[in-house]
Structure formats: structure tokens, C-alpha cells
Amino acid sequence: MLETKINLGKVTYPLYMGRNLLDNLDVLIEDHIEGKTVFLLTEDNVFKYYGNPLLEKLKSSRFKYHIIESGETSKSIDTYGEIIHELTENKQDRDTIILALGGGVIGDLGGFVASTYMRGVDLIHIPTTLLAQIDSSIGGKTGINFGAIKNLLGTFYHPRAVYMDLSTLDTLPKREYIAAFGEIIKYGLIGDYDLLLDLDQHHRAYLDRTRSVDDLILKCIRMKENIVLKDERDSGMRQVLNLGHTFAHGLESSTNFQKFLHGEAVALGLIFASNLSLKLKFIAEEYHQFVNQLIYKYFSDRYILQLDTEGIVEAMTMDKKNKEHRITFILPVDKEKVEIFKNIPIEIVEESLEEIKYGFRCK
């Protein structure tokens, strides 16, 4: 088991990474849960694999649990209300500690619950998907959707610890596993060209799961840690982590969170960002084609057959990065270089949306 620290300046917490951590979770978290009431928040697709063994291990603790339906639609104010209701019905006080066991939805929702219930209770992240392990379990962002608006309600709230059991990836469906590469490619575009070359050279092995992703996870975590350390509250530099997300959130919202997994939407958002950058002559054609072809290798089956341009643009206007009613875009401009743009004409944005409407722009 690897034990390391996530150092975000004002906040530091331990990260434990290895295989079969859930087999000994009761021992590993013993110091964190002493004197606490444990509230396990998980999802049905995860509970069916790991729920009963965990219940058995934690039964000696003061212990409650809640299972939500898997999927982005559960990241709602209704689900949030159900969890708060259960916490109050259980008469759980500020000595509660929430264990968020699951993917990105559980991490975002569990973090939001922990940060708001009684003005804050302790939180432990136990991410079980590749996307949650490389990205959403680190950095302190929490959130739920409101209507069709992605992450409209949220807080910044850090866990006491993160436990990454890499063996949970063995039960992860192939589609969810591959979806995480949208975020991994994003990190390569932001600051690690060698990572992109590795993803390109070994794409078949990654897709077949015959090549370890352990190093990828650590690289993404360290890159995010370094960025968040400089801008925890997302007011400047941290915005580069939203590369591909302006479009992605618009796509997810306009399809009612039903058609695309988040990582898939991010991958398509990277295509959009690269295409928009090319139209504005910010990025070289050769690098643009490399980016698109790399994404195509991982997401060739995730075409956009019908694109609600108006709906996506409307959703993008609600993006949290926007200021003065202008849509903010993070665009790739060169290897390991992305920039923030705030004054792109909406007509150019709509043209780029139309150009990617029927798939990937690759030679």
C-alpha cells in the first residue's frame, strides 16, 4: 500500500492507494472513526460488490448507511434531501463521519452533504471508479445539479483522508473505465505531453486493461494537487482544470444527464475546444490533428448524432467560470499549454458546435 500526502497549503490529508484496501477498511480507518457515528453513502452498483462485506466489518461501530441509485440523475437536490432526512431521522450529530464509497456522483454528493450537514461533519472519500480516483476525489470540490444545470450548488470541502482501492477497478464496467481517459487526456493537454505520447503509443493495452493505470492515477493526482495548491477556490489558475468542461457540462445538461458519461462528455469537449482553438488560429493544425486522433482512439464510438446547439449554448451561459455574461473557454494552444479566453464571439462558438455535430474532425 502506498501512503502519501495531499498538500493543498492550508489543508493536508493522507492518501492511501493499493489493492484490496476494502478488505481491511475497518482497521485502516480505525483512527478516523473512533468515537464517531459512521454513515456510509454508496450507490447500488457499488453496494452489490462491496456492501455486505463492509457492513459486516463495520457492524461493531455506530453505523448507518444509505444507498442511492447509480447515475448522474441522483446528484440532485431531491436525493440530497433524502440523505439529510435520513441523517436527522437517525439523530446523527456533529460526531458523524461520512464514508463516500463510489464514483464521482457519490464523491460530489457525499462531499456536499458532509459540508452542509450541521455546518460540516467529517468525510472520507473511497473512490471506486478510475475517473473518481484520478480527479474528483482530490481537490475539495463538492456539488449537486439543480434542474438541468450541472453543479450549480456546491462547496469547497476537503476530506479527512482518501482511500483508493485499485482492485475496485476490476469490477468497473468497460464503458466507465474508458470514460476516465477523457479526463486523463485533459491532464496531458494541460501539462504533460509525455503522458499524451504514452496514451497514444499504448492505447490498445490501456483499452484492453493489460497495461497498469497506477502511474496514470498518480500523475493526474500530482498535477491536480500542484494546481489546486496555487488556486484552491477556482478563481484563476485552477480554471485550466476545466478544459473541455464548458462544452461537456452543456452537453450533459442538454441531454438531461442521460446519454453521456461525464468522461465521455469531457472527451467530446476536448474535441470542441481544439476545434474552436483551430478556428481562432490559436493552435497549430498538426497538434490539433494529433489531439483529435488520440481522442478518437479511445472514443471512436461516442459520436454526437444529434446536437442541440441552442440548448448547449444556453447551458454554457450558466457555467460557473463565466463573468460579465461572457462564456469563458479554456483552450489548448500548444503542447502543455492551455489558456483562458473570455471574449470569443458566440457565432464562432456555434460554428464550432455545428462542425463537430456528426463526430470527430480527424484526417
Swiss-Prot record:
Co-factor binding comment: Binds 1 divalent metal cation per subunit. Can use either Co(2+) or Zn(2+).
Residues holding Zn(2+): E183, H245, H262
Catalytic activity: 7-phospho-2-dehydro-3-deoxy-D-arabino-heptonate = 3-dehydroquinate + phosphate
UniProt cross-references to InterPro entries, sorted A to Z: Dehydroquinate_synthase, DHQ_synth_AroB, DHQ_synth_fam, DHQS/DOIS_N, DHQS_C
GO molecular function terms attached to this record: 3-dehydroquinate synthase activity; metal ion binding; nucleotide binding
Keyword Metal-binding: yes
Pathway: Metabolic intermediate biosynthesis; chorismate biosynthesis; chorismate from D-erythrose 4-phosphate and phosphoenolpyruvate: step 2/7
Entry keyword Methyltransferase: no
Subcellular location: Cytoplasm
EC identifiers of the protein: 4.2.3.4
Entry keywords, A to Z: Amino-acid biosynthesis, Aromatic amino acid biosynthesis, Cobalt, Cytoplasm, Lyase, Metal-binding, NAD, Nucleotide-binding, Zinc
Gene Ontology, cellular component aspect: cytoplasm
Highest taxon in the source lineage: Bacteria
Cofactor list: Co(2+); Zn(2+); NAD(+)
Biological processes per GO annotation: amino acid biosynthetic process; aromatic amino acid family biosynthetic process; chorismate biosynthetic process
EC category: lyase
Positions contributing to NAD(+) binding: 70-75, 104-108, 128-129, 141, 150, 168-171
NCBIfam families named among the record's database cross-references: aroB
Family: Belongs to the sugar phosphate cyclases superfamily. Dehydroquinate synthase family.
Function: Catalyzes the conversion of 3-deoxy-D-arabino-heptulosonate 7-phosphate (DAHP) to dehydroquinate (DHQ).
Name listed for the protein in its UniProt record: 3-dehydroquinate synthase
